[in-house]
Amino acid sequence: MRCVPVFIILLLLSPSAPSVDAHPKTKDDVPLASFHDDAKRTLQRLWIKALCCYGYRFCCPNFR
């Protein structure tokens, strides 16, 4: 069980390989980078909100 935290830390520290598109892009293709950026931004916002609002509702920016 002592190896599990070490494995998780190494997994988080390892750089991810860049994605390679198998198909050439055409003018009709929507760039996936914008989708990835939007998803990443949304997940970061939800993560920050979850950390902030978990025990301290007064620090939550959308708390009403």
Swiss-Prot record:
Q: Show the propeptide residue ranges.
A: 23-48
Transmembrane portions of the chain: none
Statement: the UniProt record of this protein carries the keyword Signal: yes
The record's tissue-specificity note reads: Expressed by the venom duct.
Residues annotated as signal peptide: 1-22
The source's domain of life comes to Eukaryota
Name a Pfam family for this protein. Chi-conotoxin
Repeat listed as a keyword: no
Q: What is the predominant subcellular site recorded for this chain?
A: secreted
Q: Which UniProt keywords apply?
A: Cleavage on pair of basic residues, Disulfide bond, Secreted, Signal, Toxin
Q: What is known of its domains?
A: The cysteine framework is V (CC-CC).
Family statement: Belongs to the conotoxin T superfamily.
| Protein name listed in UniProt | Conotoxin LiC121
Please report the organism this UniProt entry assigns to the protein.
Conus lividus
